[in-house]
């Protein structure tokens, strides 16, 4: 069934509409009490500017300069009208909000003590009432209690003050504003009004915007306006030397005559570009303003730097890396990244962004640079033109470090001078008589300049290590040999003294010495290699980490996440571990297990509740224990929601950490769908199926010899750590009997699939409202409980990530690549919008009844290119056209064009309502048909075609034993080793 035109129009407005800026909180007026914290936020498509009684009582948010105003202690002086204007688009206009700060002790807020106008103008006396309830009792008096002149025409505006129409010279005076508060008169201080006689001058002009860029075919507007106290003036708009014939609009505002010529272009072309001039003239003179209008073929994003991309500084110096970006449309995401090679002891990167019209300045601050901070620094930015980047290479300069050693070589004495530093130091040898600590060329008996020392090491961004040899034959009595080194950073030297022949040395027997040294060096080399191998294996071993991330703040694509270890833990969650009676192990993985348990007295003193308990292995490392504690803190921070697996309690004292969560009796959604698939053979819902598709679902159970543990809620029956592996037939049978006894035997309806989809979307909308990014949205991570309620969870403890084909090795992480958005795969960017992409894959899983996404496609470079080029899977068999449209919108390559979870909820609920009404509870068909061999991704339905199958073993992978037993992935950050 199709979405009606009104619904489509609504979505187009939500996703792509542009208009005036929006001020939050909404409403034309806001009334607060003194001392309250007030925050005004302006939401717009571009740069904004605030106008009103701002300084010094307000602060601008440094993380979003210009868009957010905050005052921590509101006073009557904050009363006034605040206007937010978008700088880059005059068509968008502006939005205002008026703030009242009710202060019984101060009924008036004066914005000025003196007002000067020209005769005939409107004179505004800016005494603002602080309480809107007092505006009915206001009055205006002259100083000394005298009445206002009878011929003076004035009125009161709560937003502006008292306004005198067409002020005359005789109106010059000091005025006071009065009102009644609780029966008493409250008077403002005086405002001096000075009315000057008119002096003719050229018109004042304004040309907006000051600069304009549009893509060919877009709309644009250029506004040329002029004002003057006299009506006799003219205004024209020119492009180059050509006068444009544009209608003239006239108005009279604030005692000034205003004339406007507005050029509106519905679809700009290259001939519309050029220099535009706004010219206004009268008998007194002429004023002119100009602006540049640029029309481009497509969106652009250019990154440049006035600095060299190859930077060299000394250790301990500070450096600012600056990049300028010229972009249209606005940049949506950006981030600075350190690309190595030294990843140990890295500080958090500090940077700021300065915005102007169509231009950005990104600055990265490197303060007191350490040796480990040398390397590549990468700025990545994105707008509708795509991604662009700029890379700086920072090399540190080191002064020379020198070491002199002696060693016999072939019976001859040789001195070795080992030097490290950058730039490569020069080496000079000197021989001086006697035992001395200093020697220069004047004192030296001999001087050798080694112009070609041996380079031992020359790694990028590191010191150069060289060695110079001085063969001297036989060491001379009472001589000192100096090795002096120098580079642009500094110099260093070391000496070697030769003593008398009788004392000099007892040279070891070279025939014995050399083999011993070689043997020792060989053993040491083997030990070092073994140590490096063990270290590499340890680094490659995945660690249990917290998957969910809470955003603290963001600017562009620069996210600051809350450190979960710093979140407070509320002791109200503490539950006596003695009140837990453990049952069978529900699932186990590399890091821990999930155990069924009965909790006595949880919530109520006499309550008995079945729960699921997460715990670590006894061999868990300290960082894994910290990760589980962080997960506990995040769950408590998020709060409760019907569609997430909620925290019920925890045991953190007197033993290992235990996290108590809700128990979900039907297991994970993926296996639930696969179990139900045998009864859903759907000729009425799945047109065009062929006979081959029958096998797609008949083989799903594979004689029930494999049991999935990835949800953490399947039955094993013994309280041991169980890896994800095939189990015996008897064990499998008991599992299906136990869980399927609780499952309703009726076949699924289309409404059920819509119900699951809507509930997951509601859970994701809740997480998004809490600034939480999930990063592994998939059917295997959704559990079902009583009433077929779907809950989103985090089950990393019950996963053997090393053996799950759904997770692909990328760098030092295992990633669910087929569920990931392109920006996450290619650029390590994770946002709520990337969760929306993953949700689209989950929808495909639901409406294909548990098939693996991208069937028949291996995860390799060809897969990455397909995703990057916009390839989309075909419409699943059981998905109505409108549901497939939602999937496609979730898979938009431009993240900002993807729907929000709130919009997805609305669409799914509307579809479910229509399904209830039109299908009259029609079940999915239960006999006779087949699902179609291409049900999960055959022909791509019009715009794209299915790629050629690369591996038969990958086709319909849900039918393979290894896939049925696949475990879930350890919760990690899912970031590449960038």
From Swiss-Prot:
Record key words, sorted: ATP-binding, Cell membrane, Disulfide bond, Glycoprotein, Immunity, Immunoglobulin domain, Inflammatory response, Innate immunity, Kinase, Membrane, Nucleotide-binding, Phosphoprotein, Proto-oncogene, Receptor, Repeat, Signal, Transferase, Transmembrane, Transmembrane helix, Tyrosine-protein kinase, Ubl conjugation
GO biological process, one term: response to axon injury
Residue positions, PTM Phosphotyrosine: 544, 559, 697, 706, 721, 807, 921, 974
Domain Protein kinase: 580-914
Ranges annotated as spanning the membrane: 516-536
Subcellular location: Cell membrane
Positions where Phosphoserine occurs in the chain: 711
Spans annotated as Disordered: 921-957
GO molecular-function term, one example from the UniProt record: protein phosphatase binding
EC id: 2.7.10.1
Activity regulation remarks: Present in an inactive conformation in the absence of bound ligand. CSF1 or IL34 binding leads to dimerization and activation by autophosphorylation on tyrosine residues.
SMART domains per UniProt: IG (SM00409), IGc2 (SM00408), TyrKc (SM00219)
Cytoplasmic side: 537-978
Residue ranges constituting the Ig-like C2-type domain according to the UniProt record: 24-104, 107-197, 204-298, 299-397, 398-503
Active site: 776
Disulphide-bonded residues: 42-84, 127-177, 224-278, 417-483
Compositionally biased residues, Gly residues: 929-941
Reactions this protein catalyses: L-tyrosyl-[protein] + ATP = O-phospho-L-tyrosyl-[protein] + ADP + H(+)
Membrane topology, from the record: Single-pass type I membrane protein
Region (Regulatory juxtamembrane domain): 540-572
Modification after translation, per record: Autophosphorylated in response to CSF1 or IL34 binding. Phosphorylation at Tyr-559 is important for normal down-regulation of signaling by ubiquitination, internalization and degradation. Phosphorylation at Tyr-559 and Tyr-807 is important for interaction with SRC family members, including FYN, YES1 and SRC, and for subsequent activation of these protein kinases. Phosphorylation at Tyr-697 and Tyr-921 is important for interaction with GRB2. Phosphorylation at Tyr-721 is important for interaction with PIK3R1. Phosphorylation at Tyr-721 and Tyr-807 is important for interaction with PLCG2. Ubiquitinated. Becomes rapidly polyubiquitinated after autophosphorylation, leading to its degradation.
Function: Tyrosine-protein kinase that acts as a cell-surface receptor for CSF1 and IL34 and plays an essential role in the regulation of survival, proliferation and differentiation of hematopoietic precursor cells, especially mononuclear phagocytes, such as macrophages and monocytes. Promotes the release of pro-inflammatory chemokines in response to IL34 and CSF1, and thereby plays an important role in innate immunity and in inflammatory processes.
Family per similarity comment: Belongs to the protein kinase superfamily. Tyr protein kinase family. CSF-1/PDGF receptor subfamily.
Subunit structure: Monomer. Homodimer. Interacts with CSF1 and IL34. Interaction with dimeric CSF1 or IL34 leads to receptor homodimerization. Interacts with INPPL1/SHIP2 and THOC5. Interacts (tyrosine phosphorylated) with PLCG2 (via SH2 domain). Interacts (tyrosine phosphorylated) with PIK3R1 (via SH2 domain). Interacts (tyrosine phosphorylated) with FYN, YES1 and SRC (via SH2 domain). Interacts (tyrosine phosphorylated) with CBL, GRB2 and SLA2.
The name this protein goes by in its record: Macrophage colony-stimulating factor 1 receptor
Source species of the chain: Rattus norvegicus (Rat)
């Amino acid at each position: 069934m199709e979405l009606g035109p009104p619904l489509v129009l609504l979505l187009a407005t939500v996703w792509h509409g542009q208009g005036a800026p929006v001020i939050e909180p909404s409403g034309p007026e806001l009334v607060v009490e003194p001392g309250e914290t007030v925050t005004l936020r302006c939401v717009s498509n571009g740069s904004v500017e605030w106008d009103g009684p701002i300084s010094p009582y307000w602060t601008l948010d440094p993380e979003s300069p210009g868009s957010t105003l905050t005052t921590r202690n509101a006073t009557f002086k904050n009363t006034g009208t605040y206007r937010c204007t978008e700088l880059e688009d005059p068509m968008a206009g502006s939005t205002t909000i008026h703030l009242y700060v009710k202060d019984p002790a101060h009924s008036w807020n004066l914005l000025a003590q003196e007002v000067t106008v020209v005769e005939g103008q409107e004179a505004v006396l800016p005494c603002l009432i602080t309480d809107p309830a007092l505006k009915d009792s206001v009055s205006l008096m002259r100083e000394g209690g005298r009445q206002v002149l009878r011929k003076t025409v004035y009125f009161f505006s709560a937003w502006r003050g008292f306004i005198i129409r067409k002020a005359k010279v005789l109106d010059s005076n000091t005025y006071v504003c009065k009102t009644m508060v609780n029966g008493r008169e409250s008077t403002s201080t005086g405002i001096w009004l000075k009315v000057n006689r008119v002096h003719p001058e050229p018109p004042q002009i304004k040309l907006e915007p000051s600069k304009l860029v549009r893509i060919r075919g877009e709309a644009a507007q250029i506004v040329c306006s002029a004002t003057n106290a006299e009506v006799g003036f003219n205004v024209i708009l020119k492009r180059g030397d050509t006068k444009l014939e544009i209608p003239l609009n006239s108005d009279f505002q604030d005692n000034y005559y205003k004339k406007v010529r507005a050029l509106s272009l519905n679809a700009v072309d290259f001939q519309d570009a050029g220099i535009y001039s706004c010219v206004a003239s009268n008998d007194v003179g002429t004023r002119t303003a100009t602006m540049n209008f640029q029309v481009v073929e497509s969106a652009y994003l250019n990154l440049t730097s006035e600095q060299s991309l190859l930077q060299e500084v000394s250790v301990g110096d500070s450096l600012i890396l600056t990049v300028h970006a010229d972009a249209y449309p606005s940049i949506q995401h950006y981030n600075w990244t350190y690309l190595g090679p030294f990843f140990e002891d890295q500080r958090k990167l500090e940077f700021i962004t300065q915005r102007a019209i169509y231009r950005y300045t990104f600055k990265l601050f490197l303060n007191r640079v350490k040796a480990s901070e040398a390397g590549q620094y990468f700025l990545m930015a994105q707008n509708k033109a795509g991604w662009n980047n700029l890379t700086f290479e920072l090399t540190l300069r080191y002064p020379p470090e020198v070491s002199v050693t002696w060693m016999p070589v072939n019976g001859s004495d040789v001195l070795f001078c080992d030097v490290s530093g950058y730039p490569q130091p020069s080496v000079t040898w000197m021989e001086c008589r006697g035992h001395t600590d200093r020697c220069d060329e004047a004192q030296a008996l001999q001087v050798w300049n080694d112009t070609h020392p041996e380079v031992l090491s020359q790694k990028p961004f590191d010191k150069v290590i060289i060695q110079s040899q001085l063969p001297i034959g036989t060491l001379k009595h009472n001589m000192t040999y100096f090795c002096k080194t120098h580079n642009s950073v500094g110099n260093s030297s070391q000496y070697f003294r030769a003593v008398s022949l009788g004392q000099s040395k007892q040279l070891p027997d070279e025939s014995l010495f050399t083999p011993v040294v070689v043997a020792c060096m060989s053993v040491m080399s083997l030990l070092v290699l073994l140590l490096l191998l063990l270290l590499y294996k340890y680094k490659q071993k995945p660690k249990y980490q917290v998957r969910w991330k809470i955003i603290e703040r963001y600017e562009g694509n620069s996210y600051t996440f809350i450190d979960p270890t710093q979140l407070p833990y509320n002791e109200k969650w503490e539950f006596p571990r003695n009140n837990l009676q453990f049952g069978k192990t529900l699932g186990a993985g590399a890091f821990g297990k999930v155990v069924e348990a009965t909790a006595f007295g949880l919530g109520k003193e006499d309550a008995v509740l079945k729960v699921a308990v997460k715990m670590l292995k006894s061999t868990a490392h300290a960082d894994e224990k910290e990760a589980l504690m962080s997960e506990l803190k995040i769950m408590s921070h998020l709060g409760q929601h019907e569609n997430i697996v909620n925290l019920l309690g925890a045991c953190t004292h007197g033993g290992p950490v235990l996290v108590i969560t809700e128990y979900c009796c039907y297991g994970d959604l993926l296996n639930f769908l696969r179990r139900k698939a045998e009864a859903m053979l759907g000729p009425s819902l799945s047109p065009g199926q062929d006979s081959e598709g029958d096998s797609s679902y008949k083989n799903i159970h594979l004689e029930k010899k494999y049991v999935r543990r990835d949800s953490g809620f399947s039955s094993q029956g013994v309280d041991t750590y169980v890896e994800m592996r095939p189990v015996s037939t008897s064990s499998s049978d008991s599992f299906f009997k136990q869980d399927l006894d609780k499952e309703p035997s009726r076949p699924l309806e289309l409404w059920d699939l819509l119900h699951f989809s809507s509930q997951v979307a509601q859970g994701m909308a809740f997480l998004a409202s809490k600034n939480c990014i999930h990063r592994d949205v998939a059917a295997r991570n959704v559990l079902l409980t009583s009433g077929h309620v779907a809950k989103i969870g985090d089950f990393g403890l019950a996963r053997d990530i090393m053996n799950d084909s759904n997770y692909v090795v990328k760098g030092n992480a295992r990633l669910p690549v087929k569920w990931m958005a392109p920006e996450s795969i290619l650029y390590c960017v994770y946002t709520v919008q990337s969760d929306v992409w993953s949700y689209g894959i989950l929808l495909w899983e639901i409406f294909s009844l548990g098939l693996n996404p991208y069937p028949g496609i291996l995860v390799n470079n060809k897969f990455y290119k397909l995703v990057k080029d916009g390839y989309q899977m075909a419409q699943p068999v059981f998905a109505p056209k409108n549901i497939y449209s939602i999937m496609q919108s979730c898979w938009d390559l431009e993240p900002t064009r993807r729907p929000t979870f709130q919009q997805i909820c609305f669409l799914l609920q509307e579809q479910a309502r229509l399904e209830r009404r039109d299908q009259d509870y029609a079940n999915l068909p239960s006999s006779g048909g087949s699902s179609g061999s291409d049900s999960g991704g055959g022909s791509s339905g019009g715009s794209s075609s299915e790629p050629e199958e690369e591996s038969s073993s990958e086709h319909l992978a849900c039918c393979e034993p290894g896939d049925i037993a696949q475990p879930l992935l350890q919760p990690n950050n899912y970031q590449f080793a960038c």
